[in-house]
Each structure stands twice: as C-alpha cells, then as structure tokens.
C-alpha cells in the first residue's frame, strides 16, 4: 500500500490518516474470501457509500453547470458519467488497477482489468476518502479526476445517438430498427464488440466498443453522420 499512498500524495495531495481504511477500499471480496481466517474486510460497504456521495456530487455539479437543462437530460448525462465503463476509466487514470488486492482465481481470470471490479474499487475509494476526510475532500478529488472530462464533452458525445437516430427515422411513421453483433474479439474480460444497426433489414451503420451498448451507440452515430438518405 505504500506505493498507492505515494501516488495519492504526489498526484492528488491525499494522505490517509487511517491506512487500514484505504487498504479495505482496495480489497476485493475474492481476496477476503481466500483469507477468511485473517478476517480481512472487503470493499463492498465502502462501495455503497462511495456510490452515494458520487451521485450527490455529480448531481450538484450538473444542476449548477447546466441551469437550463431539463431533469431528463441531467439524469441521462449523470448516468453516462457514473456508469461502470466510466468509473473503470477513472480508476485506470488514477492507476488504481495496480493496487487492487484480488484472490488468486480472480487475478488469473483477468479480474484486474475487469470494469466491474475497477469501478467498484473507485467508488470504494470515494467512500473511504469521505470517512477519512470529509465531503469537501471527495469533491476536490472528483473535480480533479472527473469534471475535466465532463467539461471536455466526453460524456455528451454518446448521450443519445440511439434515441436521436430513432427520432429521425420514425418522423414519418414506425420503422423496424435493430442492432446486431457482427463479431466479438478479445478475451472474456476485455472483449471488443462490432455492431451494425439495421432498418427494415438494411445495414445503415456500424460501430465498435468495449461493450455491446457502447458499440450500439457508435453504430447509431455512424448512421446519423451518414445522413437519412443512406438509411432509407
């Protein structure tokens, strides 16, 4: 944990008073289960707390940043920011993937690169930071790690391409829109999906992503950028 403490101190000016709390935040259930006799705590409870404070602070930021956006748009943007893939990306940006304590089986199966585990650890860290410091310190960290990406428009880009495409195509009546996986490559824990979107059986766009949902969004974006003429 000393290397993690160095990263936190040098990059984020964070020094934990309770080192055990920090260690718990990076302890996956698989590691705790393999060391039951030591009664090691895992990070699920801290994840619960971190999720709550993250939702609160992102909601507050969006409410103040976009005074004219309706509730529905704010909710969609927040969902994009706090989704699993985003949280895993934040964890990687912070080098957190290097410090998660995993059981041997989970490590062997590629758990260190799994979005679910990384996202959970990121939220657990926020929960630990809240308990060790206060909500102001969590906010400072979020504004350093997450908010610059929000303001750069990273989450606006794919907010609603599927809905936008549907609205464009159905302006003159219902049409059958379907997404299908063309191929998937890579190991189970790090797959890449290729998806195409079809209208009345005709392929109108293709996209790639590390989840089916992201690939579908990219396919919809591809179709929108081609224009309606190619879709009908």
From Swiss-Prot:
Gene3D superfamilies: 3.30.160.20, Ribonuclease III domain. GO terms for biological process: mRNA processing; regulation of gene expression; rRNA processing; tRNA processing. Its main location: cytoplasm. Its cofactor is Mg(2+). Its EC number is 3.1.26.3. It is an enzyme of class 3 (hydrolase). GO terms for cellular component: cytoplasm. Homodimer. Belongs to the ribonuclease III family. This is Ribonuclease 3. It comes from Streptococcus pneumoniae (strain P1031). The gene is rnc.
């Amino acid at each position: 944990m000393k290397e993690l403490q160095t990263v936190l101190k040098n990059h984020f000016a964070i020094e934990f008073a309770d080192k055990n709390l920090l260690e718990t935040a990076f302890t996956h259930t698989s590691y705790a289960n393999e060391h039951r006799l030591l009664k090691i705590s895992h990070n699920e409870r801290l994840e619960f707390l971190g999720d709550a404070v993250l939702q609160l602070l992102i909601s507050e930021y969006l409410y103040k940043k976009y005074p004219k956006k309706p509730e529905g748009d704010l909710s969609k943007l927040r969902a994009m920011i706090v989704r699993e893939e985003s949280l895993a990306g934040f964890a990687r940006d912070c080098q957190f993937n290097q410090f998660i304590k995993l059981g041997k089986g989970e490590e062997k199966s590629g758990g260190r690169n799994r979005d679910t585990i990384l996202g959970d650890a990121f939220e657990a860290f926020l929960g630990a930071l809240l308990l060790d410091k206060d909500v102001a310190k969590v906010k400072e960290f979020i504004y350093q790690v997450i908010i610059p990406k929000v303001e750069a428009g990273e989450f606006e880009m794919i907010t609603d391409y599927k809905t936008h495409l549907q609205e464009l195509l159905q302006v003159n009546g219902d049409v059958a829109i379907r997404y299908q996986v063309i191929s998937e490559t890579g190991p189970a824990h790090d797959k890449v999906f290729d998806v195409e979107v079809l209208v009345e059986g005709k392929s109108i766009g293709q996209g790639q992503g590390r989840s089916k949902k992201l690939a579908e969004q990219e396919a919809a974006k591809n179709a929108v950028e081609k224009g309606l003429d190619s879709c009908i």
